[in-house]
């Protein structure tokens, strides 16, 4: 068995052709806004919480670096 059903999905970038940029951005934004975080064993939950404070801090740092480098936080 490769894993126990767990995976880390934290892409750091998306490469999008300019002719479909606005549409792709809207699709990504809507998908993120509709993710349900909670108890993974509860129906309707898409992902569980971050594993621990170390992971939480790592994600917060990645967001901060992105903003400092000119990214826009959509949701």
Range-by-range predicted roles:
Residues 1-75:
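ALDH superfamily catalytic-core signature
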């Amino acid at each position: 068995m490769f894993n126990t059903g767990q995976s880390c999905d934290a892409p750091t970038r998306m490469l999008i052709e300019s002719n479909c940029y606005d549409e792709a951005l809207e699709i990504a934004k809507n998908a993120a806004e509709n993710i349900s975080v909670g108890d993974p064993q509860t129906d309707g939950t898409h992902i569980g919480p971050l594993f621990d404070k170390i992971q939480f801090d790592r994600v917060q740092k990645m967001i901060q670096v992105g903003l400092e480098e000119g990214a826009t936080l959509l949701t």
